[in-house]
Amino acid sequence: MKKIFMMVHELDVNKGGMTSSMFNRSKEFYDADIPADIVTFDYKGNYDEIIKALKKQGKMDRRTKMYNVFEYFKQISNNKHFKSNKLLYKHISERLKNTIEIEESKGISRYFDITTGTYIAYIRKSKSEKVIDFFKDNKRIERFSFIDNKVHMKETFNVDNKVCYQVFYDEKGYPYISRNINANNGAVGKTYVLVNKKEFKNNLALCVYYLEKLIKDSKDSIMICDGPGSFPKMFNTNHKNAQKYGVIHVNHHENFDDTGAFKKSEKYIIENANKINGVIVLTEAQRLDILNQFDVENIFTISNFVKIHNAPKHFQTEKIVGHISRMVPTKRIDLLIEVAELVVKKDNAVKFHIYGEGSVKDKIAKMIEDKNLERNVFLKGYTTTPQKCLEDFKLVVSTSQYEGQGLSMIEAMISKRPVVAFDIKYGPSDFIEDNKNGYLIENHNINDMADKILQLVNNDVLAAEFGSKARENIIEKYSTESILEKWLNLFNS
């Protein structure tokens, strides 16, 4: 029986895009009676709560499991020990003896030596979490992190107050992994699996060992690496029979064009395509570009699975233009604000609702203020219910400069919301038929984009017609059956 392991650095409740596509893929494979689970390599003390939240929100299928390198060794340690490590908690409490507590605010206290007045510790508590920082010569030297009053991690700090060493503890308080951290760049150095008495050169070596333990070396074992940073972990295992695939979810070009510079991680995946079973990209245009740019053959086009949900029952007549994405430079939300300015000058009734978080949010907020657009452009923050937000939009706009596919645009079209997007690599031209189910705009032509938005917000019949055709096109182009068939053909080839 086939079993699929999909790899990514981390999972979290506020991850979209690639993570959502992995969740959808897992569900579709499970529906086809092929277990498809997710493997992560980061450390989170609250992963149990994160997985519960993802499943409760309906993002992650109830059948999908998450395997994690730290959880694996933690469980071994849990099974090895029967009693709590009382010495650990005694060690911590002894350091707080003979101190004076000064409460700074609710849940925050500082501790001073009762004899010398020396600053000893800082404690911050919340409902379920607590941290204790210990100081020496007024400099932080250690932090103990607790969840539900149990220590799960200790961090050691250098003289510059940067983490240089970490220790991880099991449910009973016993250390199971410790590792050196490069204080300058955060890179993981020598790692010690205390529970197994093993030493590893770095995090890569540890994760390779873990994958070899987790995944049986059989043709029915299928590894799909979605996270580009995790690819070396899969690539370097000694599996001879298990299948290995890399997936590229983004444009592989370094810049907003195709001048020849490539992203380092994606380039590494592509250059090693012939040494694994294959590399998957999401659009045929990207596959053809890669074949022209690199001396490789094992490149395949398979779209993300698209979740076809019911269309909204009502058509939005209010003049609301929507946008949902990470607020990062590649999305060029600054251009969206310039478009909004042009639109509002001609029709002050139009509103722009922008959902997302990211590094450029403060810059965008200032642009909105500087252009006096506060009554028309609204930053709504991160949303856990994008489909509900789509129901409020009359149309969706994208100023993104490059995509792997453009899943958020596809989701809008499923909801019968026409999309106005710059014609960039890769994605929009695959599913937007200009002047039939949306508009493809010459990149950076903000005047044309503004004009097309005005046409749609002021013509209910046209917007509804485009929206209906958009949904029909997506359902026809991205059927679950055809996408699943491509994967199965690849596995069986």
From Swiss-Prot:
Changing K136S: Decrease in activity. UDP-N-acetyl-alpha-D-glucosamine binds at residues 17, 59, 249, 326, 331, 383, 403-411. Keywords: Cell wall biogenesis/degradation, Cytoplasm, Glycosyltransferase, Teichoic acid biosynthesis, Transferase. It comes from the Bacteria. It is found in: Cytoplasm. The keyword Metal-binding does not apply. It is an enzyme of class 2 (transferase). Changing E411A: Severe decrease in activity. GO terms for molecular function: poly(ribitol-phosphate) N-acetylglucosaminyltransferase activity. GO terms for biological process: cell wall organization; teichoic acid biosynthetic process. Pfam families: Glycos_transf_1. It catalyses: 4-O-[(D-ribitylphospho)(n)-di{(2R)-glycerylphospho}]-N-acetyl-beta-D-mannosaminyl-(1->4)-N-acetyl-alpha-D-glucosaminyl di-trans,octa-cis-undecaprenyl diphosphate + n UDP-N-acetyl-alpha-D-glucosamine = 4-O-([2-N-acetyl-alpha-D-glucosaminyl-1-D-ribitylphospho](n)-di{[2R]-1-glycerylphospho})-N-acetyl-beta-D-mannosaminyl-(1->4)-N-acetyl-alpha-D-glucosaminyl di-trans,octa-cis-undecaprenyl diphosphate + n UDP + n H(+). Pathway: Cell wall biogenesis; poly(ribitol phosphate) teichoic acid biosynthesis. InterPro entries: Glyco_trans_1. GO terms for cellular component: cytoplasm. The keyword Cytoplasm applies. Its EC number is 2.4.1.70. Changing E403A: Loss of activity. Disruption phenotype: Inactivation of the gene leads to resistance to serogroup B phages. Disruption leads to altered WTA that lacks the alpha-GlcNAc residues. Mutant exhibits no major changes in growth kinetics, microscopic appearance or antibiotic susceptibility. Homotrimer. Assembles into a propeller-like homotrimer in which each blade contains a GT-B-type glycosyltransferase domain with a typical Rossmann fold. Assembles into a trimer using a novel trimerization domain, termed the HUB domain. Attaches N-acetyl-alpha-D-glucosamine residues to poly(RboP)-wall teichoic acids (WTAs). Belongs to the glycosyltransferase group 1 family. This is Poly(ribitol-phosphate) alpha-N-acetylglucosaminyltransferase. It comes from Staphylococcus aureus (strain COL).
